[in-house]
């Protein structure tokens, strides 16, 4: 079956953005630019970054303008487009608001104020549906998770807790989100809203933060620069979930590239959707039609 449209969802740091220690294949950027300029392709950035940091990355790395941005760890979806509109998708906000029973991040912070291990992050890192804290890196996250869940669930609030570590600052990080707010659920909501399905969607990522999508039924690509432990984990979890056929591990050598960053994205996209190979390797005219 000929592919008529593609929803291309990609993580930013160390996936689309070549900001890891591994080398980038120089020809990958040109191929990617050709691919995302096609009218058949809807480009979606999927990131933990907020709007300001996404815009900063777009300027710093000269990224193509996306059609949509899923940001703030899945709590926001923006329609962007060539006019850089940055219009929030209100339908997504309404979906995730149900989990917090009409409450905001400010309300939740008041409910958690007496927990000494939680230090609120700067206001620029918060939004209505994302409450972020600094946590001691040695903190027992299991017991703290139980306390937070018990406290909030008794108030009718259902949350997802996302733990990570800032290795530079040597501090723990915690994002308190609505239960259904995640990269995967946001992608699924956008698929439904835009009329895409599993036969014309792909996700590209590199790290543990992408794990939920990488092992889901959504066709997914792990770029070659992903850490070995991530590669082992994602293969194991995909096998357990029965989604091995929906996972592609980039290995390099595709079009004489190394599989890192954009090269890995292209390798995986062409694996799932061979029609796209012509989209980014054959020259096009100004109307984005293939030149004979």
Predicted regions and their residues:
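Short, flexible loop segments at the rims of nucleotide/cofactor-binding pockets, characterized by
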Residues: 19-23, 46-48, 179
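A short acidic/small-residue loop/turn micro-motif
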Residues: 23-26, 225
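Conserved acidic, metal-coordinating active-site core of Asp-based
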Residues: 109-202, 207-217
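Active-site flanking residues adjacent to catalytic metal/cofactor-binding acidic residues
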Residues: 10, 71, 205
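Asp-based phosphoryl-transfer active-site loop
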Residues: 3-21, 214
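Mg2+-dependent phosphoryl-transfer enzymes with acidic/Ser/Thr/Gly-rich catalytic loops
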Residues: 3, 177, 184-292
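Active-site phosphate-binding/coordination module
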Residues: 26-123
